[in-house]
Swiss-Prot record:
UniProt xrefs under Pfam families: NdhL (PF10716)
GO CC entries: plasma membrane-derived thylakoid membrane
Name the record gives this protein: NAD(P)H-quinone oxidoreductase subunit L
EC number(s) stated in the UniProt entry for this protein: 7.1.1.-
Keywords assigned by UniProt, alphabetized: Membrane, NAD, NADP, Plastoquinone, Quinone, Thylakoid, Translocase, Transmembrane, Transmembrane helix, Transport
Bilayer disposition of the protein: Multi-pass membrane protein
GO molecular function (one): quinone binding
Catalytic activity, reaction form: a plastoquinone + NADH + (n+1) H(+)(in) = a plastoquinol + NAD(+) + n H(+)(out); a plastoquinone + NADPH + (n+1) H(+)(in) = a plastoquinol + NADP(+) + n H(+)(out)
S-S bridge residues: none
Similarity comment text for this entry: Belongs to the complex I NdhL subunit family.
Amino acid sequence: MANEVFNSSLFVIGTYLFLGTLYLVFIPLGLYFWMNTRWNYMGKIERLLIYSLVFLFFPGLILFAPFLNLRMNGQGDV
């Protein structure tokens, strides 16, 4: 009985860690990559979808904001 509770607790903790990592790390990084490559070529519907995903995954995006630069190439002095 105690072993079942321990195993189910580990499963729940592992699931929370997996979903938290997915929400805070992997999906925001994929979203940054998508925005960086498609920013100048997006249509209206795609841009609306991206804006809604930015709203949904804002906590993860704000974690990576200090480390990523989304300025266009060729801006500024060399």
